[in-house]
Amino acid sequence: MQKLGPGYTFAETLSEQLQDTIFFVVNARGGTALERFMKNDTAGYYEKTLFRIKQALRERPDLKPATIIWHQGESNRDDYQSYLNHLNTLVADLRSDLGIPDLPFIAGEIGRWNPDYSHIVEKIALIPDSIPYAGLVSSEGL
C-alpha cells in the first residue's frame, strides 16, 4: 500500500494548471537506494513498476505515459559516485520497455538542509545535462 506523499499535492496542482485529469502510477519506496529500482534487482521494484504501468494502461487504453517523476537520493548519500550512471540506465530501461524513447524524466531535488546530502544533491543537479529529455525541480529555498 502506498502512503500519501508529495505526489498527491503535485498532481492536484498540475491538474488545476493544465485543467485536465492527471493519473499517477506510483511505486514509491521510502528509504530505498536507487540500485534497488534497477532492472533485475532482487527487490523486483523495477518489474513491479512496469507491471503497474502496464496494468493501468490495460485498464485505461486511452491513456499514455507522459513523464517519469523521480524524487529519491537520501539513501544514496554515501554511495553517490555511480548515482548518475545507474539513474541513466534505469531511465533508459524504462523508456525502452515502455517503447517511448523520448519519455520525459523529471527529478525532484532532495532537500539541501542536511549537509550529509551535499554530494548527492550535487549529482542530482547534473541530471538535466546527463540524461536526455530530463529536467530538474530545485529544492532551493525550501
Each language-model region and where it sits:
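Cell-envelope and extracellular/periplasmic
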Residues: 1-142
